[in-house]
Amino acid sequence: MGLTASARELWSKVDVLKDLEPRVKELMDAHEQKRELWMPSDFLGPDPESCPDRHIVEMRKRAKGIPDPVRAALALNLLTEEGLPHFHRLLAVYLGDDSFWREWNNLWTAEEDRHGQVLHDYTRDTLLFHQRKLEEMQFEYLRRGFHPSWDHDPYRVFAYTTVQERATQFSHAETGRRVAEYEPGLAMILDHVAREEARHFSFYRTIFEEILKRDPDQALHSASFILPSIDMPGASMSGFKDLADVIRRSGIYGPRDYLRIVQEQIRYWKIDNLDGLNELGRIAQEKILGIPERLRKIADYVETKSKAKTFSFEVVFNREFAMP
């Protein structure tokens, strides 16, 4: 029995990824050469001359002033980072176990693991959250799994990781700006995390650019399913919608930021200039080029319909706070 059309399509895409291995090695080498490897203890420990107990007391005193809406944003950012096992699994399915893809996936996993660790350690040391509730949320999030509709298509995986890494970078960076006046130490942590997310974003965006060069019609078709909207990894966690709403109302991350991200990728990948496409590619190209206007209308609608709301989260000690 021969392969089905969908199976042939999948194997064709896997072949393209294999062809990309030399480029993966180049990008990985460049990534490591530019990187300054940091560890969570670089930010959380006291200076050698300082008293450890006093260091913790002062850190808690500064963190106490962080507003609850920003704490809620930080909780969602942290839990999103703790979903790393889901992404390692998704990438490992297509990247294989004996290639530079495996080397990249392992490196990316090791780097990303520090993001969740440093944020988790910081919030525990500063008593920023109800720690038991945070851990329960993390447990349930991982237990529920992450099974997106695109996980059967390796091209969609890379289109998704491109925009998801950029969105995560935006959220960490803006959260860092919001906490800077209260706790410069946390702002520094978030700045380092955001800058590393930016480097990961650059890697995945370049990979998808290379896929477009090799298989433009199928690449555009895959991207046309991802770019209209993405479910962030934490969408399955309890309270996600309200946490995301707080982030939007705070101006940390929302529909207009996603619009910027999509516009940025359309420009970088030069989607409007691609020619020589077959019917599949032309239809996908037209769909993608129409996405920004649709996202703009969504952002306008959300902002117009938004009304003042009161929130409370167990992880932020059930304290109520109102937001316009």
Model regions and ranges:
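Non-heme di-metal
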Residues: 1-324
